[in-house]
Amino acid sequence: MALLGIKLMTLVFAAWLSCCHSSSALPSSGLSGPCLNHSCLLRNSLNGASQWGTILHSPAVGSNCPPCPMMSIMGCSPPKPLQSNSYGVLCSTIASKAKQDLKLCWKEVQTRSEMYSKRISAALIDSLHQAVGMLLMIIIWIWSSIFLVVYHVLAYMTTYHLSSAVCVGFLIFCTICAFRLISWICGDLLAFNVSGLTPIWVNFSESSCPAGLSLRRYKNEKTVEGYKPFIIPQKSPKKSVIELSFSNGSHLGYATCVRLWDGSICLMTAKHCLVKEALLKGRVAGHSLPVKNFDLFLTCDEIDFSLLRGPKQWEAYLGVKGADLITSNRIGRSPVTFYNLSKDGEWLANSAQITGRHGKLCSVLSNTSPGDSGTPYYSGKNVVGIHKGTSELENYNLMIPIPNIPGLTSPDFKFETTNVRGNLYNDEGFRLSVGEDDKAEHWTDRLMKSITFKTKRWADWAEEESESDDERGKVVPPAKPSNYGEGCPPEHNQYLSDVGDLLTKVIGPEQNEKCVDILMGIMGVDKNEVAPHKEEKAEKGKRSSGFGHGKNRKGTNHPMRRGYNFRNCKKGGGQDESESHREISGRDPGRESNDKSPQGEAEEFERYFSSFYSWKLHNSGEANSGFRPCGKIPKFYRPRKRRVSEWGQNLARKHSSLGEITQGFGWPEAGAEAELRSLRLQAQRWLERSKSSVIPSAIEREIVISRLVESYKICRSEAPLCSSGSDLSWKGFLEDFREAVSSLELDAGIGVPYIGYGYPTHRGWVENPRLLPVLSRLVYARLQRLATLSVDGKTPEELVRDGLVDPVRVFVKGEPHKQSKLDEGRYRLIMSVSLIDQLVARVLFQKQNKLELLLWRSIPSKPGFGLSTVEQVEEFIDHLARVVDVKSDDLLENWRELMVPTDCSGFDWSVSDWMLKDEMEVRNRLTINCNDLTRRLRNSWLYCLSNSDLALSDGSLLAQEVPGVQKSGSYNTSSTNSRIRVMAAYFAGASWAVAIGDDALESIDTTLAVYKSLGFKVEVSEDLEFCSHIFKTRSLAIPVNTSKMLYRLIYGYEPECGNLDVLRNYLCALASVLHELRHDQDLVQNLSKWLIPDGSQKIS
C-alpha cells in the first residue's frame, strides 16, 4: 500500500511538471504511432524507467508485453517502452482518457434522465386524468344524491304531513303580507323613536352597542380631495356651537344649541356622538353639564340625528344661544360654513359647499378632521344640518339634514329666508318624518301631546342681545324706490384725470338707485304698484322701444334702464324686423288672455315659433362641404363689421411703438357671406382630416374610458332630480330648473328662433314674471320629447320639426384676427345654442360640471383654475410639480425633459362623433344613480347636438351631414373639450396629462404621431405654454396674445365719443389689460399715459 501511494504521488508530481513544459513531448517520443494502445502504454509506464533514471517495478504487472499485431502487419519498428516517456506525457495520456470517459458518462446520464423524465410526465398525466374523472364522478354522485334526498323528503311530507306543511306555508305567506302592510302604513313613523311620557336617559355603553357590530358604511371624518376651503378665526353665530368632551376632558365632538319653532331650546348633535359620561363644555369658563342630564327628545337612527331637551335655563348656564333651523325641505346647493376648535382653543370658521344628495343625507365638500362629528353647517346664521362623516367610496363628506316637522322644526306658514338656489329634498325621495301632508298634521298632533314644555313659549320669548333675530312670520314689504330721472347719474357726467377716482365713480352701478328696478323685477314685484306715478313714462318708453331695441331714445343706453325696458316692453308693436316676422308667422302668443295656464301658453308659444320655419329647399348656388341647405327662417340678425376706431388710429399715429405692437391684426368681416365662406373652409379641412383618421378598436376605447373614469372618480355626482325615477318628475325638474336659471348668463344671446319674440338676451325671459313659467314648461316639454321619442336615424331638420332641438346660430366672433386668417377668409365661428337647449343641458349636466370646477386640483381637466394673481400662478406651478412628482424649481428648469406642451389647431372641428359618445359614457359612469331614463335623455341630447341645423345670419338653414363637431356655444363645451383632450393624450400613450380646452401638458412618453390618426393637428410649443400663458418663473406667467389684447382695446372703443356706456366698458377693459401686463411695468406706465382719456373732456 505504501508503495502504491508513493507511485500515485509520483504521478501527481509528474502531472504538475507537465504543466510547466510544452505539450510537444508526445510526438517527439513516438507515442503518436499506430502501434500505440492504452494497455501497452499503461504497462510500459508502470514497468519502465523515467527520464530521470528512476526505474519503477510493479509486482502486479508482468514485464513482458506481447508484440503489437499492427507492427507485424505494417512492418513498423516496435515502439519505445513506456518507461522511456516522461511523466508529462503519461499524465496527459491519462487525462485524455479520463476526459473521454467523463463524456461517455455524461451522455449516459443525459439519456437516462430523459428516459426517466418521460416516464414521470406520463405518470403525472395519467394520474391527472384519473383525478379529473374521479372529481366528475363525485360531483355526479353528490348532485344525484341531493335529488334523491329531496325526492324522498317530498314523498315523505306528501305521504304523512301534507296538511301540516300546507298550513306552515300559508302562515309564512300571511306573515310576509302583514309585515309589508304594516311597513307601508306606518313605515315612516317607525323612523323616529319619540318618548314624552317617560324621560329617556342617554345611556350608550360599549357593551350594548359595540363598534365592531356597527353596520354603517360611513367613516366619521375625511378631507375632500381637490377642495380648497378658506379658514378664518371666527366665532359661531350666537355662540351656538358647544364642544363635547369625554369625562377625562379629551375632545369628543360638537353639539348645537337650537331654537325650535315652538319656542323651546334644545341640544342637537349626531347620535353617534352621544356616549356614556359625555360632557358639554360651556362658553363660560368652568361651566359644563353632563349629557345624562338631558332627555333624548327626538332621534332618528336612519340618519344619525338626535335632539335633546335639557334642564331649565341650561343654555344660559353654558353661555350659548339657540340658532334657527333650515329643514330638509328648504336645503339647496349652496356655500355653507362649519365651526371647530383649533389646537390652541380658538374657534375657526371653515368654508364648505353643499353639492347634492347621498340617500337621505347631503353630500358636502368640506375638509374635516377627527373630532368634527356633530358640528353644524350654517347658511348665513341658520343651521342647515349636522356633520355626519363621509362615505367610504365617494369623495365628499356627509351632512345630516334636519327633519321637517311643521310647528316644531319648521313653521306652519310660508316666509322668506336667506336660503339658496333650489332644494335638495323637495320631492318624494326624502320622507323621514312624514309621508303625506295629512300624515304630517297627525304626526305633529301626536308629538305635541307627548311633550311637556318646561321653557317659555315662543310668544313670550325675548333675547335682548340678539340684534339679528327677525320677528318670525312678519313679512317686511319691499321698500319703494325713490324718485329718479330718466337720464344718466350725475356723477357720470365728467371725465376725471385720476384713474382710481374714475374707476370708483364710473364702475359700481350697484350704488345707483336704479338698481331697484332689477331687484324688483327678480322678486316679481310690479313696478306700477310701487311707483304708479311712473306709469305714463313707462308706457311712453314701451311705445318707442318696440321690443326693447330703443337705441335712439334718451336714457335707454344706461345698463340699469335697459333691464327695465326689457321687462316692461310691449309684446307687440315696434318698427323693426320682429313686427314683420309676426305678420308672416301669425298670432303673437303674448297677446293671448292671461287666464291660460302656463302649459297652455307654452303650447301656443311652440306653435308660434314653429311657424317661423320654411322647410322648402332654397337654391344657394354652390354646395357646402358637409352641410346642405334645408330651409330658411326670417332674417333676425343684421351683424356688421366692426370699424377701426378713429381714436385708435390717432393713437397709433401719435405713438409709433403702439402701432408696431398692434400690427398684423384686423377686424373680420361679418354677415352670412363671411359665415358661409369660413364654414366652407373649416368644413373642408374637417372632412379631409376625418378621412385619414382611424377609429380605435372597441378594446382600446374601453381601456381609455376606464382610465378616464378612474382619473375623474372624485367628481362622481348624482343624476338630475327630474330623472332620478323611472319617469320624468315635474317636482324634481323645478328644482333642477331653478338651479339652472340661477347660473345663467343673463346678457347672453337668446338664440334662434326665440329672438323672433323680441327679447335678444336671456334676461328678457328670465326676469319676466309672466314668461318665466312659460320658459319652464318649454324646457320640460323638450325633456319629455327627448325621453319618449326615438332620435335614431333622424335628419337634423326632422329633429327640429319634432321639437327635439333648435337650430344652432352661427356667426363670426367679433374679435381681432391675424392678417393671414383675414386674407384666407378663415374666421372664428361661434355656434350658439338657444336658451331652451342651454337650459336642457344645464339640467342634465350642471352637477357634474360645477363639481369639476370646484375640484380642478385633483382631476386632469383645469377649466376651474385661473392665472389672474401671483398666488394663482404659484398654486398652479406647485400643483403641476406634484403631478410630475418633482420640485417646482426643477420643473421650471428641466420641463423639456418632463413634459410636452401641445395645442390642437381647429379642435372643435376635429372632434369626432365617437369621441363625443365615449365622453358621454364617461359622464354616465361618473353619475352615481344613472338609470335608463338619464342615459336616454343624455344620449338623445348628444345625438341632436352632433346632428345640428346651422342658422346663418340671413336665415339660411344648413343641415349637418356628418355627425360630430363640437358646438362652441354649448354648455358642455369647456368640460367636454378638456376631457376629450385628455382622452386623446391617453390614446397617444401619455402616462399623465392636464388640459383646458385644446391646450394640454402631457408626459414625455406621449407619441405625437397618434394624434394624426385620431384626426387632430397637434402643434408643440417651444415654451412652457398653457392656457395662453408662458410660464417663466414660479410667480410669473406672461400672456401670449398681448398684441391682440391691445388691438382690441385701442381699435375697438371710442372713449371720446361722449357715451357713458362706452366709457365705462373701455375703462373696464383698460384695467383688465393693464393687470394682464403687470409683468412689464414700463409698458404699463406708457399705456397709462397713452390710453387714459383727457380729463378735461366732458360728456355731451
UniProtKB/Swiss-Prot annotation:
It comes from the Viruses. Residues 530-542, 578-595 have a biased composition (Basic and acidic residues). Pfam families: Peptidase_S39 (PF02122), RdRP_4 (PF02123). Keywords: Host membrane, Hydrolase, Membrane, Nucleotide-binding, Nucleotidyltransferase, Protease, RNA-directed RNA polymerase, Serine protease, Signal, Transferase, Transmembrane, Transmembrane helix, Viral RNA replication. Residues 550-561 have a biased composition (Basic residues). GO terms for molecular function: nucleotide binding; RNA binding; RNA-directed RNA polymerase activity; serine-type endopeptidase activity. Residues 1-25 form the signal peptide. The keyword Transmembrane helix applies. Precursor from which the RNA-dependent RNA polymerase (RdRp) is probably released. RNA-dependent RNA polymerase plays an essential role in virus replication (Potential). This is Protein P2-P3. It comes from Poinsettia latent virus (isolate Euphorbia pulcherrima/Germany/Siepen/2005) (PnLV). The lineage of its organism: Viruses, Riboviria, Orthornavirae, Pisuviricota, Pisoniviricetes.
